[in-house]
Amino acid sequence: MIRELEYYGSHILRRKADIIPEITDTIRQLVQDMYETMVAHKGVGLAAPQVGESLSLFVVCVEGETEDGDLIFCDFPKVYINPVLSNASEDLVIGREGCLSIPGLRADVYRPQSITVTALNLDGQEFTEHLEGFPARIIMHENDHLHGVLYIDKMEEPKDIKKFKASLEKIRRRYHAHVKPEDRAS
């Protein structure tokens, strides 16, 4: 089932997600729904808070990059339950990011070139991956959602931040009548 997305201004996007204590049929159905929602919106990753569930879970549908930098997409998403990131490289690289919860906007964000992620899969088995480049960026972006952080919080260019304020306000107004002050971008 394709779920409705949560958009900028939604309080759930600013909350720390809850740890998933047990992988149930409800969680399995959520993963399927998230995959269908991600595909319908042409995304490469989706975190549970983006579909209204404050749970520590995200799905990604990029397996890697070719030597030419083209993305290799998967047939079914990779599932990351209760992920923990570690070993972020000291090398920061700039990359353009967008977000299904902030439609129509993209910005340059600095992130580590590589990262290690440890998480549970849908069978409850722990796995660890070391990722580099764009796949690492996707993991960091989706993991940020589980901590109430949006990519716009990481923008460093004052001109970009200023340019985004009016656009963010339009998104907030379009999708939400009332937003708590702590959920607004600074």
Swiss-Prot record:
An individual GO BP term: co-translational protein modification
Cofactor: Fe(2+)
InterPro entries in UniProt: Peptide_deformylase, Peptide_deformylase_sf
Cofactor notes: Binds 1 Fe(2+) ion.
Molecular function GO labels: metal ion binding; peptide deformylase activity
Catalytic activity line of the entry: N-terminal N-formyl-L-methionyl-[peptide] + H2O = N-terminal L-methionyl-[peptide] + formate
Catalytic machinery residues: 142
UniProt cross-references to SUPFAM superfamilies, sorted A to Z: Peptide deformylase
Protein name, entry field: Peptide deformylase
